[in-house]
Amino acid sequence: VKVAGRLADELKSSNNHGVVWANQFDNTANSKGHYETTGPEIWMQTDGKVDGFVCSSGTGGTIAGVSSFLKEKNKNIKIYLSDPAGSSLYNYIENGELKGEGNSITEGIGSSRVTANFAEAKIDGAFSIEDKESLPVIYDLIQNEGLSLGTSCGVNIAGAIRLGKKLGPGKTIVTILCDRSDKYNSKLFNRKFLEEKGLPIPAWI
């Protein structure tokens, strides 16, 4: 990200056509997009009967935009961050300290800093999700539902399960399914890799 920003600055002086740097982590057009689209879609598809929303943070745009919209509609909706082990955001939400603990094979989510997008999120609490909790979710969905989802989805769904248990029966919990499993073939479906990491392995691998 820093290299991209520096390159954009360098090109501004030499490119007559101008330069566009999306800067998805700190450009709050990201969270605004989710405030204007994803949040309303969730509200509409649940007929406004959503009790909790939980998801991870990469850029922070999704959880910031969705949480801002849902909290405007109903301040009692619970918003939780689902954070992979090794990320600093769980401790930031729960303890006010940017401190990562553990590690994860999950890619693309979690962070060691608070992005401009994430800073706008309206979050009630956070869950720290280890691989031993998220991977079985992924494997179960492949085997039982025919859904081939990636590691970010595993973290999100594991968080949704936790929030469901926390809020109790009869609640509507929403999360985001944001990646496919084929992006992680060398990890998710590699028995040797999983054995070396001491991670859960389904019988069918």
PLM feature spans:
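Active-site/ligand-binding loops adjacent to catalytic centers
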Residues: 1, 5, 11, 18, ...
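Structural signature of the thiamine diphosphate
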Residues: 2-24, 148-151, 155-172
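Active-site/ligand-binding-proximal alpha/beta "capping" segment
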Residues: 15-58, 66-68, 120-124, 128-147
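Short beta-strand segments
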Residues: 22-25, 56, 81-83, 174-178
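Short acidic, glycine/serine/threonine-rich loops at helix termini
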Residues: 32-36, 64-69, 90-94, 185-189
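Short glycine/serine/threonine-rich phosphate/pyrophosphate-binding segments
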Residues: 56-67, 89, 152-160
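Surface-exposed amphipathic alpha-helices with a cationic face
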Residues: 67-74, 164
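Phosphate-binding loop/pocket of nucleotide- and phosphate-handling active sites
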Residues: 158-205
